[in-house]
Every structure is written in C-alpha cells, then in structure tokens.
Amino acid sequence: MHAPQPAPSPPGAAATGEAAEDRALRYLQARGLSVIARNYRCKTGEIDLVMRDVAGTLVFVEVRARVARSAQRFGGAAASVTPAKQRRLIAAAEDFLAGHPGEVPACRFDVIAIDGTRIEWMRDAFGVEA
C-alpha cells in the first residue's frame, strides 16, 4: 500500500504562493527582520522564510495565503497550518539548525496569514513540545 500523496496544486498556485512569500518578506523586512534563507528545503519539509529579528531570534516563517472566497468556504489561511504541517516545519527547522553548527540561538515559529488583502502576523504561532 502506498502512502497517501498530497493533492496536486491548482494551476497558478506556485505563482500565487511565490507572490504571497514576496509580500510576507517585504512586510517582515519593513518591521526590522532580516532574511537568512528563503524556501529552505530538506527531506523532512520546507520552510518558506528563515529570518532573524532585531533581538537576534531565529524566526522560521510559514506563509499561508487564501483568496477571499476560499477563505470564506474553508477557513482563513491560518487554519491551514495543521498539526501535521507544524510537525513538518519543526523537523525542517531541526534540519536547518543541524546544518548550521554552533550555539543554538533562540528560535520561534511565526505564521504570516494572507487572506485576500489582509495580512496577519502571528508571532510564536506554535512551539515544540518536550
């Protein structure tokens, strides 16, 4: 038996996702964060943006975007960051940190939710449970 595969993305989804990431990047840079990596990929997943805030905290950012009509039908962009997605992001962050040896900085997971024209920045949106 094969593991279930994610549904294919609708046409234009990659361009929409890239535009949302561009918008999120500009939004966060305007608020003092600096980009460390973009679209970090590893065997366990992908992190849209890896940034550092003014206090030196390493920030792993998941960008979620929904057009207004799908947000009404299926919930907002933030609702699409499921516990399974959170686990994949945490695993990818662990991989990122393993590839950057040295003292582990303070880290957090933020979500940028874009619903139509609205941007919501959820700092420390979820954490790693011990």
Swiss-Prot record:
Q: List the disulfide bonds.
A: none
**Cited Gene3D superfamilies:** 3.40.1350.10
InterPro entries the record matches: Restrct_endonuc-II-like, tRNA_endonuc-like_dom_sf, UPF0102_YraN-like
Listed GO MF terms? nucleic acid binding
Family under the similarity heading: Belongs to the UPF0102 family.
List the protein's name: UPF0102 protein RSc3265
